[in-house]
């Protein structure tokens, strides 16, 4: 639905200070939905192979989980350094803990609304993935395939 797509573009702009619309235009991508999941697919592919079935194509933007939209790890990794909002920097003492896929339980920053999905980076501004703000911790959203 066009109104849902526009709503998503606006949501990304408001929450992360990032123009997804500009990326779509500059990289010649189109938003494509499959169930509750959104993908960024090259326009050239759609122009030439629009009727072909697919199981995996393009970059996963994210998906709805209930009423919340969760950006994919791949999208955060690729574009998170360009975000202006929704970024949380973790102290170096938690870096190994985070990369092992564990949550950070000593959350001292209470400025985030519970349930917010943030881009997590380290003190050197390296993007580490996504995290979900909970009442007592930051839930690590790092996919298991990246846990070391």
Could you tell me what each predicted segment is?
Residues 1-148:
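Polybasic, low-complexity RNA-engagement segments
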């Amino acid at each position: 639905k066009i109104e849902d797509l526009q709503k998503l573009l606006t949501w990304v702009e408001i929450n992360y200070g990032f123009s997804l619309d500009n990326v779509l235009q500059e990289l010649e991508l189109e938003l494509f939905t499959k169930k509750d999941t959104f993908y960024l697919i090259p326009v050239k592919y759609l122009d030439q192979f629009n009727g072909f079935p697919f199981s995996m194509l393009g970059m996963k933007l994210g998906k709805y989980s209930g009423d919340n939209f969760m950006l994919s790890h791949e999208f955060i990794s690729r574009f998170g350094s360009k975000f202006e909002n929704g970024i949380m920097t973790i102290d170096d003492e938690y870096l190994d803990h985070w990369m092992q896929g564990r949550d950070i339980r000593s959350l001292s920053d209470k400025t985030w609304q519970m349930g917010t999905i943030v881009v997590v980076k380290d003190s050197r501004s390296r993007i580490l993935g996504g995290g979900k703000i909970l009442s007592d911790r930051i839930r690590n959203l790092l996919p298991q395939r990246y846990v070391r």
